[in-house]
Amino acid sequence: MKDLVDTTEMYLRTIYELEEEGIVPLRARIAERLEQSGPTVSQTVARMERDGLVHVSPDRSLEMTPEGRSLAIAVMRKHRLAERLLTDIIGLDIHKVHDEACRWEHVMSDEVERRLVEVLDDVHRSPFGNPIPGLGEIGLDQADEPDSGVRAIDLPLGENLKARIVQLNEILQVDLEQFQALTDAGVEIGTEVDIINEQGRVVITHNGSSVELIDDLAHAVRVEKVEG
């Protein structure tokens, strides 16, 4: 499977992202994420199914085979290690990190990946708080970590809560307008905020600045409640 094209890796990573966000991975969701037509996605998924990487379930959701999941984990691991390098060492503008890492994930050699694990201070989570998967496969002892916190969209309706931002999933990173609004408000990983889940939207407030996220993006923010 060494000759797999980047399109296949992008599809597998997208399915992995959807699973992380608690969204059923359907071909329609991939079309939305990758801005591709329905027929193009269907053709690519059919090829991936023939290659033994995914299985289309009776409910039309996509399930990765063990081989497909292994490749998805490898791609996501390189992606998030690249994000750490770009942020911690190169100092790239945080708004450009995700797109740049999307390029690096397809070309990073295994040797470079292992070297990154040695030189980076934090290889367990990306700069956006997302767990870096499959570190044991490259020689780093690590127990599997469950996703921390709760999705903002799953918070009790109508309650104004104190919370700490712990994860910003990929779909929010590519919505530069919303991502910029959050960073302009001083919201980043570890920031304590006021947050309220209203019907159809989530409002995050920090230092007097409020950012409204619709449901489609609110599921991409994970928080931990802060007592007191």
Swiss-Prot record:
InterPro entries named among the record's database cross-references = DtxR/IdeR_SH3, DtxR_MntR_Metal-Reg, Fe-transptr_FeoA-like, Fe_dep_repressor, Fe_dep_repressor_sf, FeoA_core_dom, HTH_DTXR, Iron_dep_repressor
Q: Name one GO cellular component term.
A: cytoplasm
Gene3D superfamilies, per this entry?
A: 2.30.30.90, Iron dependent repressor, metal binding and dimerisation domain, Winged helix-like DNA-binding domain superfamily/Winged helix DNA-binding domain
Domain HTH dtxR-type: start-end pairs: 4-65
GO MF terms listed in the record are: DNA binding; DNA-binding transcription factor activity; protein dimerization activity; transition metal ion binding
Localization, per the record, is:
Cytoplasm
**Do the record's keywords include Iron?**
yes
Name its GO BP terms in alphabetical order.
Answer: negative regulation of DNA-templated transcription
Checking SMART domains in the record gives:
FeoA (SM00899), HTH_DTXR (SM00529)
Keywords assigned = Cytoplasm, DNA-binding, Iron, Repressor, Transcription, Transcription regulation
Q: Which family does it belong to?
A: Belongs to the DtxR/MntR family.
**Subunit (UniProt):** Homodimer.
- Function of the protein: Iron-binding repressor of the dipheteria toxin gene expression. May serve as a global regulator of gene expression. Represses ripA under iron excess.
The protein's name in its UniProt record: Diphtheria toxin repressor
- This protein's species is Corynebacterium glutamicum (strain ATCC 13032 / DSM 20300 / JCM 1318 / BCRC 11384 / CCUG 27702 / LMG 3730 / NBRC 12168 / NCIMB 10025 / NRRL B-2784 / 534)
Gene for this chain: dtxR
